[in-house]
Regions:
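A substrate-engagement module of RecA-like helicase motors
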Residues: 1-14, 64-194, 199
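Conserved pre-motif I regulatory segment
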Residues: 2-42
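Walker A/P-loop
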Residues: 37-55
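Walker A/P-loop NTP-binding motif
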Residues: 53-64, 85
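Conserved helix/coil segment N-terminal to the catalytic DExD/H
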Residues: 185, 201-216
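Conserved ATPase-coupling elements of RecA-like P-loop NTPase cores
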Residues: 205-207, 231-238
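SF2 helicase catalytic motif II
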Residues: 218-232
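Single conserved hydrophobic/aromatic residue that forms the stacking wall/gate
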Residues: 259-268
């Protein structure tokens, strides 16, 4: 594995401007050993170490089912669109790779059609965006809304044309066979390397615990980039919180009960 990071290694040969760094090489060795032994590994690498390549190369060399989780969707897109293809090409990797996000990141064809039919009832700007999205829906391969450049990210049309767990029709949907979410999940199930984000990974844990299926396939190797973000994100899925508003409401309820309930003397 360390040969990939040598001055005459595969990465240096295939990537213009690649310069071997000893910390990067050491990290790659540690990742390789952890994968081979099936042991956990925590790595803290300084800025400029090149940690992405240091875990990607061993992961691809392992020829196992790999899940890579990033701290944000922006990093997820960068890893999938730039870093992973670069290292894959350098190592002549022939496995299948997939990108998987939560359902709200994909265009829902059924909801898009419903909004188009209700066009006359929509505000002008939203209707204009829906029309643009109908055109884009015929061009996009994966329905990933982050790749749509014709409609602004903050457009009020997006919530109307993406789905949630509550409004998704599932297999009863007339557009089910063309569903971008279903296609993305199937591709992930069949892929050798799947790139997800921490939010989706933890949401998958919740789904699996409920016994209602899974969002992410099982894997031999799990890699968490920006793993220090996991505790805070995990608390959103598995923690319990109490807001000041809830405490105030509780205090009001208790006060109301104290003033409206009969005293023990009155109940004799």
């Amino acid at each position: 594995m360390t040969d990939d990071f040598a001055p005459d290694g595969q990465l240096a040969k295939a990537i213009p401007g690649f310069k071997p760094r000893e910390p990067q090489r050491q990290m790659a060795v540690a990742v390789t050993q952890a994968i081979e032994k099936g042991q956990p590994l925590v790595v803290e690498a300084g800025t400029g170490t090149g940690k992405t390549y240091a875990y990607l190369a061993p992961a691809l060399r392992a020829k196992k089912k790999v899940i890579i989780s990033t701290g944000s969707k922006a990093l997820q897109d960068q890893l999938y669109s730039r870093d992973l293809p670069t290292v894959s090409k350098a190592l002549k990797y022939t496995g299948n790779v997939a990108l998987l996000k939560g359902r709200s990141n994909y265009l829902c064809l059924e909801r898009l059609e419903q909004q188009a039919l209700a066009g006359g009832d929509l505000p002008v700007q939203i209707l204009s965006d829906v029309i643009l999205l109908r055109s884009w829906s015929n061009q996009t391969v994966d329905g990933d809304i982050s790749t749509c450049v014709s409609v602004a990210e903050d457009s009020q049309a997006w919530p109307l044309v993406t789905s949630t767990n509550d409004n998704c029709l599932g297999s009863d949907c007339p557009m089910y066979k063309d569903c971008f979410v279903v296609k993305a999940r199937k591709k992930a199930m069949d892929a050798d390397v799947v790139v997800v984000n921490h939010h989706l990974f933890l949401a998958d844990m919740v789904v699996k615990e409920s016994g209602f299926g899974e969002l992410i396939p099982e894997a031999d190797v799990m890699i968490f980039d920006e793993a220090h973000q996991l505790p805070d994100i995990a608390s959103q899925y598995f923690g319990q919180s109490l807001s000041s508003r809830q405490l105030l409401d509780l205090a009001k309820d208790i006060t109301c009960l104290l003033y409206t309930s009969p005293s023990p003397r009155d109940t004799r």
